[in-house]
């Protein structure tokens, strides 16, 4: 359980842990077309990562070099992109600190992340989805008309004929979501696990079952079976499998989860799920953060404090 200990702390409230985390994976990855990268004379993102040079700056420079809407060359796409890049700075809007809920809307790192998104928008590096009935256009990736598509790896974990990106399997590229230069490589994380309900009739059975699921994620034979499935069903190469594992390892080492959605739908609607005009996605659609923050921070602080008080009362 050692490598999921940090992830378990994310759901630590008042000194009690509320999720038995059996695995951690990256919530999103950067998907790219190797052929597009090569034809444009750009550096391969995975190779930049290996060289320690994959960060917000190199990500932005590549978008600047590629983007040309007049030539039907679009930059950043994906409904997951805004949240993924926000979390890659390392500070979510709501988190548990020493067992208590804390809001971070006035944190300098959050401001930095929002300003980064606003800058990408102002430079025309974020695909204008209003031109496409407000839909993402992942198929542009396979057509060489889009540089980066940020989504969960699940988008390319099926028969390649079903991939919405339409990237030929031999040209599929994956990289972690970049973080600020000089920062740890934080990744938005998916925590797979179990919750033991109060009054459960067989808590020892739950513990044993959790051990079994943990074993399935760490046993060499089980991992080999999963790897073979990726080769057979997804046509992934050994290299792609290794890259995906390394990205998930980053999520285990540097996991970031925003608790806003779990606090309440009201908090989520003002932060992670706020849409294009308010909250954490709005900067990527031209909404300046200082104004946005002023509108939501007091209300979010109040709503989160109410829930934190309720958790404290339960303890």
Q: Where would I find each of the regions flagged by the language model?
A:
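Alpha-to-beta junction loops
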Residues: 72, 142-152
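Extracytoplasmic/periplasmic substrate-recognition and gating elements
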Residues: 163-234
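Extracytoplasmic/periplasmic solute-binding protein
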Residues: 9-30, 38, 55-102
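Short helix-initiation/N-cap motifs at beta->coil->alpha
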Residues: 52-58, 128-143
